[in-house]
């Protein structure tokens, strides 16, 4: 048991070491004062992997505040040239060990502490970079004395040993050997943090420092002391008006490289009073290691700061202003703020495949997932963890998934939300000819549709068809589903065409609908038929969508009757999409835009079988291929695509009485089976430099939509009909886990 020794705030006690640093920790108040949090520590990996050089009285390597091997025996040394070290780099004064612990001590403090305005809970983290390694360069003797030649040699040796940051809690001097040492160490990539001094005067009484290189100035920081209330410590030097002079035209005031950090009543070991003795230390010697440890954290989190030598500048730029507004001769840049330093500085940007830099804030939505590609969830996932860079070239993860949008399936009671029973009215003419027509004006009631046909809502729609006695068909329309016209021309049966409406979206027809359409059906010898059809998208409704694809398709079909009941057909379709790709929509001006038009071809196989005069079976299956498309933004292009769709329907045109009709259908809308998108994305190398490359992202949807529909229609009285329908959709838009059900009814009366 240790007895407390009251001697100038010195006391003895046992400390508990920490096995590791992770999860939520409690931090000493002088650490939270400068913005250290769990998120900062975890982002910096607690400073792991970097070396801190401590140029001082040495460091007691076996002190319980350090982890085993944390103070490097092979890299540390006695760097003094004016005296002989009695015990190598080991500390025989206590100052150097305290400084090293403040910057990078591994162990937490086991007891509660309340002194000097700081109240620390038991078990608090009390060091800035606990997992950093330490290089001790002993340059001061047991009395704490040494010469500039000793200090300059220690700085050089720390740099040669690989120190990323060198802490010098020693009176600053501007002698030639000190300047040469600073130039030498910074040329090797080290940052140097120098205590501002404890004489309560301007640094060097306003004298300049001559002979530093411009690179050295950018890697050099001075640190003054504040108390727990951010007031200037009574003993602390100030930057004054002196300058770091590179040449007659390049000069930087001390205040421009000056930061403030806590330096009063800082808890640290006092190894000269006992192996478990602690003291509350005060001085800019304590402020400097707070900044040194912070530089270690920054360079551990972002190696690019070490590569570019910009960590010190970042701390200056993100400091909290104290005293007079702006940089001043008392507080310099102000209080170091690690919370701010760990946030993006300046605009976050990314570089497109075209080599141009783009601000993340300027990127807007440019891709609407739909059709066979579903929601493009894999691409969205990649974009949700996209890498962007701030003005210090640091990598940050940003979420760009909102650049892709998609419709969501929602349960609905809207009456007849799909094309159920939208067959035209057929009028039989003398001589065996027929005339069919249909027209309506859609209301502005957007409903979920796989291919976005709701975009054309509140538009006049119509369709007219003439069938001659020899079987020739001619049709034209606006806004009507081209599937009906093509299947009618191919099979010469209204019931087949009518049932095919419920199987809409299983092929390329659905990607070019809503605008003008036309079809021709021609009888061939032996009862065979030839069908030609063309359709295009219409003008989008600006109230519903600001962006849509312009597409047109041409289809050629051939059918053969194997018996009066069985007919089979095959159709070739060519689809051209502008600002579209397999039903998805993009803006060519956006970062997710593709270049040029996309071209698709498809084969559709269909078969109708009449079970009886009133009962019909219809099966459809389509396969399609889409050519690859290039891009030059965040996307580098799309590979060739393959997709499939199928549907099966049954209809009874006279279930209980004449004129009623019942239909059952199941379909899988067109779905991508193979294809990928190239995403231009960055990773960082070991030095922190961005390395851009194309990442192939599969576009095959994670779900498979299946639609089940039951529809019934019956006449009620003269010119009155009742239509009922229920539809269940599984994995709507091929999005796994998104299901909906629609139930509705329509009573219609014609006058």
Descriptions of predicted regions:
Residues 403-606:
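Outer membrane beta-barrel translocator domains of Type V secretion systems
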Residues 26-133, 161:
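Active-site core segment of subtilase-fold serine proteases
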Residues 56-59, 64, 212-296:
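Extracellular S/T/G-rich loop segment that most often corresponds to the catalytic His/Ser-adjacent loop
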Residues 33-40, 156, 165-167, 222, ...:
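C-terminal subdomain of the subtilisin-like protease fold in secreted/lumenal serine endopeptidases
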Residues 100-103, 108, 137-140, 164, ...:
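Hydrolase catalytic cores
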Residues 462-466, 518-522, 556-560, 605-609, ...:
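Residues on the lipid-exposed face of transmembrane beta-strands in outer-membrane beta-barrel proteins
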Residues 495-510, 531-533, 546-548, 569-597, ...:
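Outer membrane beta-barrel transmembrane domains
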Residues 26, 41-48, 121, 136-219, ...:
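Substrate-binding/access-modulating region of protease and related hydrolase catalytic domains
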């Amino acid at each position: 048991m240790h007895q407390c020794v009251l001697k100038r705030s010195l006391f003895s006690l046992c400390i508990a070491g920490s096995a590791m640093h992770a999860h939520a920790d409690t931090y000493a108040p002088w650490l939270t004062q400068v913005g250290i949090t769990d998120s900062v520590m975890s982002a910096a990996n607690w400073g792991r992997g970097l070396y801190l050089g401590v140029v001082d009285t040495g460091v007691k390597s076996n002190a319980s505040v350090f982890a085993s091997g944390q103070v490097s025996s092979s890299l540390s040394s006695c760097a003094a040239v004016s005296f002989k070290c009695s015990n190598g780099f080991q500390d025989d004064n206590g100052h150097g060990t305290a400084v090293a612990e403040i910057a990078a001590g591994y162990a937490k403090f086991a007891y509660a502490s309340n002194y000097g305005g700081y109240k620390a809970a038991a078990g608090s983290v009390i060091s800035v970079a606990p997992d950093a390694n330490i290089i001790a360069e002993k340059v001061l003797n047991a009395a704490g004395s040494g010469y500039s030649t000793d200090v300059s040699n220690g700085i050089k040796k720390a740099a040669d040993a690989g120190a990323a940051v060198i802490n010098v809690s020693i009176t600053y001097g501007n002698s030639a050997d000190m300047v040469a040492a600073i130039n030498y160490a910074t040329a090797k990539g080290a940052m140097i943090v120098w205590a501002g001094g404890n004489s309560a005067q301007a640094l060097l009484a306003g004298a300049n420092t001559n002979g530093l290189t411009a690179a050295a100035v950018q890697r050099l920081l001075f640190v003054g002391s504040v108390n727990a209330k951010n007031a200037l410590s009574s003993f602390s030097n100030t930057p004054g008006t002196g300058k770091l002079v590179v040449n007659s035209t390049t000069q930087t005031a001390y205040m421009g490289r000056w930061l403030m950090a806590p330096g009063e009543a800082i808890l640290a070991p006092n190894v000269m009073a006992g192996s478990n003795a602690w003291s509350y230390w005060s001085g800019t010697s304590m402020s400097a290691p707070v900044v040194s440890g912070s530089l270690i954290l920054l360079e551990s989190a972002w190696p690019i700061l070490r590569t570019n030598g910009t960590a010190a500048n970042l701390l200056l730029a993100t400091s909290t202003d104290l005293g007079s507004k702006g940089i001043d001769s008392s507080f310099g840049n102000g209080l170091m703020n690690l919370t701010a330093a760990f946030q993006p500085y300046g605009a976050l940007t990314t570089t497109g495949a075209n080599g141009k830099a783009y601000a993340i804030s300027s990127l807007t939505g440019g891709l609407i997932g739909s059709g066979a590609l579903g929601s493009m969830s894999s691409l969205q996932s990649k974009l949700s963890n996209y890498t962007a860079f701030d003005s210090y070239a640091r990598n940050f993860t940003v979420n760009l998934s909102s650049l892709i949008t998609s419709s969501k399936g929602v349960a609905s009671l809207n009456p007849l939300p799909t094309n159920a029973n939208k067959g035209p009215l057929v009028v039989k003419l003398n001589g065996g000819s027929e005339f069919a027509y249909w027209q309506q004006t859609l209301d502005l009631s957007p409903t979920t549709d796989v291919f976005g046909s709701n975009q054309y809502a509140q538009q006049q729609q119509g369709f007219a068809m003439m069938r001659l006695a020899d079987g020739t068909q001619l049709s034209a329309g606006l806004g009507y589903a081209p599937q009906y016209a093509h299947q009618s021309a191919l099979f010469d049966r209204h019931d087949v065409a009518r049932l095919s409406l419920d199987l809409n979206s299983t092929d390329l027809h659905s990607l070019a609908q809503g605008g003008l359409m036309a079809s021709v059906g021609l009888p061939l010898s032996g009862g065979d038929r030839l069908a030609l059809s063309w359709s295009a998208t219409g003008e989008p409704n600006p109230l519903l969508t600001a962006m849509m694809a312009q597409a047109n398709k041409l289809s050629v079909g051939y059918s053969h009757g194997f018996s009066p009941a069985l007919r089979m057909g095959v159709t070739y379709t060519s689809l051209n999409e502008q600002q579209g790709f397999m039903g998805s929509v993009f803006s060519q001006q956006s970062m997710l835009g593709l270049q040029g038009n996309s071209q698709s071809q498809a084969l559709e196989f269909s078969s109708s079988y009449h079970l009886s005069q009133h009962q019909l079976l219809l099966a459809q299956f389509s396969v399609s291929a889409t050519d690859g498309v290039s891009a030059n933004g965040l996307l580098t292009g799309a590979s060739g695509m393959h997709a499939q769709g199928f549907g099966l329907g049954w209809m009874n045109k006279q279930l209980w009485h004449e004129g009623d009709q019942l239909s059952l259908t199941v379909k899988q809308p067109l779905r991508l089976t193979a294809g990928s998108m190239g995403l231009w994305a960055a990773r960082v190398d070991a030095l922190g430099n961005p390395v851009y490359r194309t990442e192939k992202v599969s576009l095959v949807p994670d779900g498979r939509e299946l639609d089940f529909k039951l529809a019934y229609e019956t006449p009620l009285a003269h010119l009155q009909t009742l239509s009922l329908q229920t539809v269940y959709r599984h994995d709507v838009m091929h999005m796994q886990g998104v299901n909906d059900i629609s139930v509705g009814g329509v009573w219609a009366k014609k006058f």
